[in-house]
């Protein structure tokens, strides 16, 4: 489709104990890639769609000569604190307000799968692609974390639109 994003609105879940959301959507497609995820804040959904359209697809075409068909994620909403950091452990994660997404795998048009866990430390095209799209997340998200940040992120990219700023 020519749309950058296909999504439907999700009913608000009023915040309780720092968890919940307003103005969230469920994305079914972004930048031409199929996608299935839980509720995501409108600003995070917009950032995600722009990232797929202007970073993921161009990188896939440049490196593999084809587009990404689908993107797998580990989730959007989760009522919890930040994981993997002693300093931030008492702060609510952006996942607690559906303002973050964890991306784990990409599938190309020919069925080739690219996994953050398996391919990040490789030497070939898959690693090149993952490093390009991880860095590209910094254009659209306030926080971009990947396997080089800490062990908690060894198998996914964390992207969010919260108050903090970090490109790792």
Residue spans for each PLM region:
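Short, solvent-exposed polar/charged micro-motifs at secondary-structure junctions
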Residues: 16-22, 79-85, 156-158
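Catalytic cores and adjacent binding grooves of peptidoglycan-active enzymes
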Residues: 16, 57-58, 89-168
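Active-site-adjacent substructure of cysteine-protease-like catalytic cores
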Residues: 62-98
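A short linear-motif detector with a strong N-terminal bias
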Residues: 4-7, 48-52, 79-85, 94, ...
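N-terminal start-of-chain detector that recognizes signal peptides
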Residues: 1, 42-45, 72-79, 87, ...
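Residues that form or immediately flank small-molecule/cofactor binding pockets and catalytic motifs
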Residues: 32, 75-76, 121, 164
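Active-site acidic/histidine clusters and adjacent loop/turn architecture
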Residues: 1-72
């Amino acid at each position: 489709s020519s749309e950058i994003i296909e999504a439907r609105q999700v009913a608000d879940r009023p915040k309780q104990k720092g968890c919940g959301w307003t103005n969230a959507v469920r994305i079914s497609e972004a930048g031409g890639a199929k996608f299935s995820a839980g509720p995501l804040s409108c600003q995070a959904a917009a950032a995600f769609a722009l990232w797929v359209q202007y970073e993921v697809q161009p990188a896939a075409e440049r490196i593999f000569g084809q587009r990404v068909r689908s993107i797998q994620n580990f989730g959007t909403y989760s009522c919890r604190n930040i994981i993997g950091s002693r300093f931030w452990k008492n702060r609510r994660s952006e996942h607690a307000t559906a303002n973050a997404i964890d991306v784990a795998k990409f599938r190309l048009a020919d069925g080739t799968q690219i996994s953050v866990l398996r391919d990040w430390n490789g030497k070939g095209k898959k690693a090149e692609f993952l490093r390009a799209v991880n860095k590209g997340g910094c254009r659209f998200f306030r926080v971009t974390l990947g396997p080089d940040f800490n062990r908690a992120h060894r198998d996914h990219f964390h992207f969010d639109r919260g108050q903090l700023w970090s490109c790792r």
